[in-house]
Swiss-Prot record:
Chief location category: plastid
Cofactors: Fe(2+)
Purpose: Introduces a cis double bond in the acyl chain of an acyl-[acyl-carrier protein].
Cofactor binding comment, as recorded: Binds 2 Fe(2+) ions per subunit.
Subcellular location: Plastid, Chloroplast
Any GO BP: fatty acid metabolic process
UniProt-listed PANTHER family: ACYL- ACYL-CARRIER-PROTEIN DESATURASE-RELATED, ACYL-[ACYL-CARRIER-PROTEIN] DESATURASE 4, CHLOROPLASTIC
Oligomeric form and interacting partners: Homodimer.
Taxonomic source organism: Oryza sativa subsp. japonica
Gene Ontology cellular component annotations, sorted alphabetically: chloroplast
Protein name stated in the entry: Acyl-[acyl-carrier-protein] desaturase 4, chloroplastic
Enzyme Commission number(s) from the entry: 1.14.19.-
Enzyme class (EC, first level): oxidoreductase
Length: 418
């Protein structure tokens, strides 16, 4: 699960310009472009350096909705989610690949098993072949690959977030309930993604692995913020969006790797994208089933997720040198992903349109409250709005000089931002 988000995926252009002391230089036009696109992909995290997070108060919560009504709605959501355990057993668990037939990172990398001279020679030859392919990969694609790998490596955070969703969580760590088995199986399959990308990058010799590893360390330490993390509705919607975004991101990276002659990397990203596609199918089907059972609750939850923006799982990544907001490492990485075509504003608009159509939001009628109908109207008009904003951002960007940024991941080499 990585996206520059969605994600896994992607925010906007930034202007962390290339200069020896890493100071920021930006034009007002570029800053406006960043803010516009940043609003499309994800809201800034509350816990930014030098700023206190908003404080939850009972008064604020009560102002949003009467406490008894909100609590009752949450209990109903949890019970509906729990009622799907048999459905999950029949429809979602078969999407997970049995371990004995699943691919493993070792399948795509030179064999490092100890042995005689022939084994060592074969390993050395395999690494040389991998490095020859990696040598042709442009720096902007490497930045996207590292950003996706860093996000994948923060898997412990995502499993802990999954276990906060009431009705879906693994309450004991070994629960036999289908929802819990799905979460553990999903985690096990996702764990291979970061492992495989990490080992490829290590063997490629193209990146500063210590800086990359320190970025993973910081992301795990910093954590992740998510709208309504205890809500099963929000959690399943978020999962569907994230998995589709990562499928798109890894798929585009595979295409770019192939175009630049790295067949090994193309195969690696392709097999990861295929996993994300299966996982997307699970979360999408589960969300679709909930739309059938509680169309009003799901329409309002989907609108909540869209209004709050789909916060990227890697949004709090840091290499220890970056700033806040448009100068953050995540914003710069996302700007490169936009320019490289790994994950773009157009992809995000297509993604929103896909789910609104897939869950038949426009066709919802019976059972919608006034708030549900307002959510429906908002959702059905969202994709066209995103596309208009994207077109405006690109017209503005065309009138300004592209910025450059240095990335510690690639030994401070400069890369052009979107």
């Amino acid at each position: 699960m990585a996206s520059s988000g969605l994600a896994v995926a992607a925010t906007a252009s930034s202007a962390w310009l290339c200069c020896p002391n890493h100071h920021i230089h930006t034009s007002s036009s570029r800053s406006r472009k960043h803010l516009l696109l940043h609003g499309l992909y994800g809201s800034a995290p509350a816990r930014t350096r030098g700023r206190r997070p908003p404080v939850w108060t009972a008064a604020a919560a009560t102002a949003a909705a009467p406490a008894d009504t909100a609590a009752s709605a949450r209990r109903e959501q949890v019970e509906i989610a729990r009622s799907l355990n048999a459905w999950v057993e029949e429809n979602m668990l078969p999407l997970l690949t049995p371990v004995d037939s699943a691919w493993q990172p070792h399948d795509f990398l030179p064999c490092s098993a100890a042995g005689g001279g022939e084994a060592l020679a074969a390993f050395t030859e395999g690494v040389a072949e991998l490095r020859a392919g990696a040598a042709g990969v442009p720096d902007e694609v490497l930045v996207c690959l590292v950003g996706n790998m860093v996000t994948e490596e923060a898997l412990p955070t995502y499993q802990s977030m999954g276990n906060r969703a009431e009705g879906l969580a693994d309450g004991t760590g070994v629960s036999p309930l289908p929802w819990a088995r799905w979460l553990r199986g999903w985690t096990a399959e996702e764990n291979r993604h970061g492992d495989l990308l990490n080992r490829y990058l290590y063997l490629s010799g193209r990146v500063d692995m210590r800086q990359v590893e320190a970025t993973v360390h910081r992301l795990l330490r910093n954590g992740m913020e998510m709208l309504a993390p205890a809500s099963p509705y929000h959690g399943l919607i978020y999962g569907a969006f994230q998995e589709r975004a990562t499928f798109i991101s890894h798929g585009h990276t595979a295409r770019l790797a192939g175009q630049h002659g790295d067949r090994a990397l193309a195969k690696i990203c392709g097999v990861i994208a295929a996993d994300e596609r299966r996982h997307e199918a699970g979360y999408t089907m589960a969300s679709g089933r909930l739309f059938e059972l509680d169309p009003d609750g799901m329409a309002r939850a989907l609108a909540d997720v869209m209004r709050g923006k789909v916060t990227m799982p890697g949004q709090l990544m840091s290499d220890g040198r970056d700033g806040d907001g448009e100068h953050s490492l995540f914003a710069r990485f996302s700007a490169v992903a936009e320019r490289a075509g790994v994950y773009t504003a157009r992809d995000y608009g297509d993604l929103v349109e896909h789910f609104v159509r897939r869950w038949r939001v426009a066709e919802l009628a019976a059972g919608l409250s006034g708030e549900g109908r307002r959510a429906q109207e908002y959702l059905c008009g969202l994709a066209p709005k995103i596309r208009r904003m994207e077109e405006l951002a690109h017209r503005r960007a065309a009138r300004i000089e592209p910025a450059m940024a240095r990335f510690s991941w690639i030994f401070d080499r400069p890369v052009m931002l979107g």
